Amino acid sequence: GFGTGDGNPLYYKDKLTNTNGTRRSTYNIGFDLEIIPKKLILKENSALYHVDDQTDKFEKSYQQQNATSPNLTRKAEAKYIKQNQQQHSVTLTYTDTFKEKHNLEAMLGGEYFNWHQYTLNARTENSPSDDIPTLNAGSNRTYTYSYKEGYRILSGFARVNYNYNYKYLLSVVAR
């Protein structure tokens, strides 16, 4: 809870600012193409997911209730995180019936997945004024950090289904 040194919360309302925002976007597109009607079909699907996350903080000079001198450190912080993810899948499927009792379905496909993230974070202090709430005004850089990470996966797969008169089934799958 509040202590005796906390003072009036309304006093701090404009002294300690913190703004943040997140933008998320998702895009998806795909198609089905009948190369040979009802027998050979190509399917593709692609998806993109993007996130931007930004945070800005700034502490104006302020006087704590029980302190003898004001806090003049004027700390500023900025953080930015960007993420991208994409996925692409494609399959080619062949379906046919031979001599009215032999049913065959063969599928060949592949998939590509990519995810990466970029993070940037920095802090400064001792800005000369409460009117410049950005990192460039701080005379003392206290923290700087940036990092990139990511991974990719490429895979292929195949499946063959055979049945005789819809009674006996043989299925082979590979990935």
Residue ranges and their predicted role:
Residues 46-48, 61, 109, 125:
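Flexible domain-boundary/linker segments
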Residues 109-116:
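Glycine-rich, aromatic-flanked loop segments that form ligand/cofactor-binding clefts
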Residues 9-57, 77-97, 105, 117-119, ...:
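Outer-membrane beta-barrel transmembrane strands
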Residues 102:
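Histidine-centered active-site/metal-ligand motif
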Residues 1-11, 56-74, 116-144:
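Surface-exposed loop/turn segments flanking beta-strands in extracellular/periplasmic regions
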